[in-house]
């Protein structure tokens, strides 16, 4: 530990103590808030089922930066490199297409055994796992419908895929001792004017009810459902809208997933958290960065990321909100993308934990909005960076931008050799 870092830390403790904040307690709380990293940043959402297949479902990964993972071994190695550079607790979020098998496996036939390597790896790296059925990039999703498909046989295929995915998710939770949050997102929708908007939603409702009919221990598995405003090729109508899934999660008491890029550009999910929490037992957050649309850019330490973190902390939602990331940028080093986005989410959580919320709440309750605004702005200048650097130091991870040197070395020695 450098003298400079120690000096900055001591000064920071004093500055925060002056506004009633115990920085040690803030760091202890930060150590209880895992962030679920998404595996698909590492290979541009290709997966191992059909790595050369096209990405469909109205989503896009743009760019062609060299060195993307081509198999599970490479993906896990890249993840390990990123994990070493991110302080504090982490989880890993898997999609069904990241299964491992020597023979082709139909999606409605996936089993826990196809993910046993991921479980053993998670145990070795002390990670929890989360899961997602993959309802896109498949011949039976090519016409834009899955769980709401008008063809009963195709619809049943996707129902069976989601049911099989829930068994995999429960296996994760049972093996790792921490519940797996399994999120259902489907691309179902229409490109142009839609006459019958009701029937697909009726089919989706019935399909979801069948999907979640098998009961699992909530200590092992948690169901979540995710809405979206539109996707490429589904600009005019999305079956799984916000209103649909808010109603579903409320009536069935599942978790609701809020994705930062799945709403109108003028909407923010930070404002939706407190409203949803009045009706649903849990929230899953997909923290992302939409640029004009659901572009899934790397998460920044920007106003919305900070607002999301602040909502969690201010309302003490630590046990009810699950924090996940969802971005995929193929134009930059993929390991660096993980590190940048995840460290930024954790920085936002730390800054929220260092806020004198009780004092601000009292000012708000008394109607002193002048002081509220003044203190909100002044606390941005408090030395939270020194607290962050101490946190990194205690977790044996680089401070500042020193982590980039490690990524560059890994790129030169490993990534550059991938064809």
Curated annotation (Swiss-Prot):
Q: Which gene encodes it?
A: rhaA
Q: Which GO terms describe its biological process?
A: L-lyxose metabolic process; rhamnose catabolic process
Q: What is its main location?
A: cytoplasm
Protein family according to the UniProt entry: Belongs to the rhamnose isomerase family.
Q: What is this protein called?
A: L-rhamnose isomerase
Q: What does the cofactor field's note say?
A: Binds 1 Mn(2+) ion per subunit.
Q: Name one GO molecular function term.
A: L-rhamnose isomerase activity
Keyword annotations of the record: Cytoplasm, Isomerase, Manganese, Metal-binding, Rhamnose metabolism
Subunit record text: Homotetramer.
**Cellular compartments per GO CC:** cytoplasm
Per the record, the pathway is:
Carbohydrate degradation; L-rhamnose degradation; glycerone phosphate from L-rhamnose: step 1/3
Q: What class of enzyme is it?
A: isomerase
Q: What is its EC number?
A: 5.3.1.14
| Catalysed reaction equations from the record | L-rhamnopyranose = L-rhamnulose
Q: What does this protein do?
A: Catalyzes the interconversion of L-rhamnose and L-rhamnulose.
Cofactor(s) for this UniProt protein: Mn(2+)
> Which locations, inside or outside the cell, does it occupy?
Cytoplasm
For this protein, the record's NCBIfam families field holds:
PRK01076.1, rhaA
The organism is Salmonella agona (strain SL483)
Which residues are recorded as binding Mn(2+)? 262, 294, 296
């Amino acid at each position: 530990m450098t003298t400079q870092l120690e000096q900055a830390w001591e000064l920071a403790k004093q500055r925060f103590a002056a506004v009633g904040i115990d920085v040690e307690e803030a760091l202890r709380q930060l150590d209880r808030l895992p962030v679920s990293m998404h595996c698909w940043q590492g290979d541009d959402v290709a997966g191992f089922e059909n790595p050369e297949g096209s990405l469909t479902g109205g989503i896009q990964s743009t760019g062609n930066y060299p060195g993307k993972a081509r198999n599970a071994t490479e993906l896990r190695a890249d993840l390990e490199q990123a994990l070493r550079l991110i302080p504090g607790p982490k989880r890993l979020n898997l999609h069904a297409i990241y299964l491992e098998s020597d023979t082709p496996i139909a999606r409605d036939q996936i089993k826990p055994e196809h993910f046993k390597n991921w479980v053993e790896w998670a145990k070795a790296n002390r990670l929890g796992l989360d899961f997602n059925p993959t309802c896109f990039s498949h011949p039976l999703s090519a016409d834009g419908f899955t769980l709401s498909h008008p063809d009963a046989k195709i619809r049943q295929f996707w129902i069976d895929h989601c049911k099989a995915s829930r068994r995999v998710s429960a296996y994760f939770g049972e093996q790792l001792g921490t519940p797996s949050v399994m999120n259902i997102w489907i691309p179902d929708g229409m490109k142009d004017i839609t006459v019958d908007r009701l029937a697909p939603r009726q089919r989706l409702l019935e399909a979801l009810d069948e999907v979640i009919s098998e009961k699992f221990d909530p200590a092992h598995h948690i169901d979540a459902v995710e809405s979206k405003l539109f996707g490429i090729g589904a600009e005019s109508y999305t079956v799984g809208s916000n209103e649909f899934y808010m109603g579903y999660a409320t009536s069935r008491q599942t978790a609701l997933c809020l994705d930062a890029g799945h709403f109108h550009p003028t909407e923010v999910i930070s404002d939706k958290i407190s409203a949803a929490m009045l009706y649903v037992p849990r929230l899953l957050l997909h923290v992302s960065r939409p640029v004009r649309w659901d572009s899934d850019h790397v998460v920044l330490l920007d106003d919305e990321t900070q607002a999301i973190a602040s909502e969690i902390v201010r309302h003490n939602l630590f046990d009810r909100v699950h924090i996940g990331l969802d971005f995929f940028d193929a134009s930059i080093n993929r390991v660096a993308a993980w590190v940048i986005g995840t460290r930024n989410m954790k920085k936002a959580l730390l800054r929220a934990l260092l806020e004198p919320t009780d004092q601000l709440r009292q000012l708000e309750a008394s109607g002193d909005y002048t002081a509220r605004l003044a203190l909100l702005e002044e606390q941005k200048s408090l030395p939270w960076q020194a607290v962050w650097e101490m946190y990194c130091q205690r977790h044996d991870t680089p401070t500042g931008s020193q982590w980039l040197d490690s990524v560059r070395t890994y790129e030169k020695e490993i990534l550059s050799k991938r064809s």
